[in-house]
Amino acid sequence: MKNTSHLVLQGKGGVGKSFSASALAQYFIERGYNVACADTDPVNSSFYQFAALNVSLLKIMEGGVISQKLFDPLFEELLSTDDVCIVDNGASTFIPMLKFISDNCMLSALQDAGKQLYIHTVITAGQAKDDTFNGLERLIEMIRAEQSNTKVVVWQNEFWGVPVFDGKPLDKTELILGNSDIIQGICPVIDRNSDAFTADIRNVLEAHLTLQEVKQSEDFGVIAKSRICRVYNDIFTELDKVFGREVIDDE
């Protein structure tokens, strides 16, 4: 997984992108990688607020408008570093980012430079279900158009229930099955159906704490820490499945 870049992209806001980005960063740190993190969200820079992850806040707005030119430094860094790079992008950044990537053939540029790009996106149930699914479709279309080696990791956020499409679970949909060469895997973030788990994770996210900080904090009791560890360890286990071969090869 060295020399890889990870963009978290979804056009629908409030679906858990920053949580996914922070969990992903912690996963790679736990697995022993050097990680560089960045946040491009001009509206709600939640990822940037995780101080322990040393996230860089990238300026992409000029005169109150997102400027594609300001994406240049980000992708130049992705092309030049050997670190595992994780970039969280806000909902308002989704369309400008996709246009920049397509206009500048960035998927091919990264591939030609020997980099492996993973795009992470979030799928949910509830009112945002169709919007998040459409976002996944757009990402796959972009990758197909450029015929690159870019892979997609789908985070299935089950907070609003398990998403079902025309009676089928996500992994049985035509979009997933028909694009198995692009889909690296699905990482479920399960709903524990417990107000205790929900409250604990909410407290962690509102304080912008990492799992390691929670373990050392006196603000969480032993049982709460156990619940929080279970949530993150389950996600790490799912990511091991998603990236299994690559992680093993690095070891």
Regions found by a protein language model. Give the residues of each.
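Nucleotide-state-sensitive switch-loop elements of NTP-binding domains
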Residues: 2-7, 30, 34-94
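Glycine-rich phosphate-binding P-loop
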Residues: 8-22
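Short amphipathic alpha-helical segment that frequently serves as the phosphate-/nucleotide-binding helix
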Residues: 18-23, 133-137
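Amphipathic coiled-coil/heptad-repeat helices and related helical stalk/stem segments
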Residues: 21, 67-71, 132
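Charge-biased, low-complexity intrinsically disordered regions
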Residues: 24, 178, 228-229
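Rossmann-fold NAD(P)-dependent oxidoreductase module
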Residues: 27
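Conserved catalytic-core segment of NTP-binding enzymes
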Residues: 95-199
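NTP-binding/hydrolysis catalytic cores, primarily Walker-type P-loop NTPases
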Residues: 198-251
